[in-house]
């Protein structure tokens, strides 16, 4: 460690997770609210509510309608997704990046084949039931809890968390 780094933060002991993680080593964690959906937890902030995960949807899985309370962006890593919003239907293939703005309601995300997405949630997402009432809310605190339960070290939001 450099002399300036030691003077800035003498307690800093690099662990190797400061800026990245090998997601191949992370376990898939089931999301009880959505049958056929599991995640790999990577990062979650208790301060901002943001969290980053890799989502796996089994073939044929449809995520319930949801309201993205703070927006999100996603990159389809593998598979094929059908995204429905009102009367519009989009087919997403690997390499497709998308953004959903805050307070947007999405009618459905359906995996035509087993699919994996890298998703950055800027805050909580509210999953809706068939009557379009909130059935469950997924937050950064849920991600932190799941990571702790499965022994996953999350990438810190700041170097102070290292």
Model-based region annotation:
Residues 55-57, 61-66, 89-92, 103-105:
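A cross-kingdom feature marking solvent-exposed beta-strand/loop segments within repeated
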């Amino acid at each position: 460690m450099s002399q300036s780094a030691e003077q800035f933060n003498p307690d800093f002991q690099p662990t190797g997770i400061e800026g990245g993680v090998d997601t191949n080593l992370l376990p898939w964690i089931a999301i009880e609210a959505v049958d056929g959906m599991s995640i790999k937890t990577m990062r979650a902030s208790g301060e901002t509510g943001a969290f980053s995960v890799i989502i796996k949807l089994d073939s044929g899985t449809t995520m319930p309608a949801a309201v993205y309370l703070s927006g999100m962006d996603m990159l389809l890593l593998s598979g094929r997704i059908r995204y429905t919003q009102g009367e519009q239907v989009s087919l997403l293939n690997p390499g497709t990046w998308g953004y959903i703005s805050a307070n947007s309601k999405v009618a459905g995300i359906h995996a035509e084949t087993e699919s994996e997405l890298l998703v950055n949630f800027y805050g909580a997402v509210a999953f809706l039931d068939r009557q379009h009432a909130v059935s469950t809310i997924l937050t950064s605190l849920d991600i932190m809890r799941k990571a702790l339960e499965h022994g996953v070290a999350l990438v810190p939001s700041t170097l102070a968390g290292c």
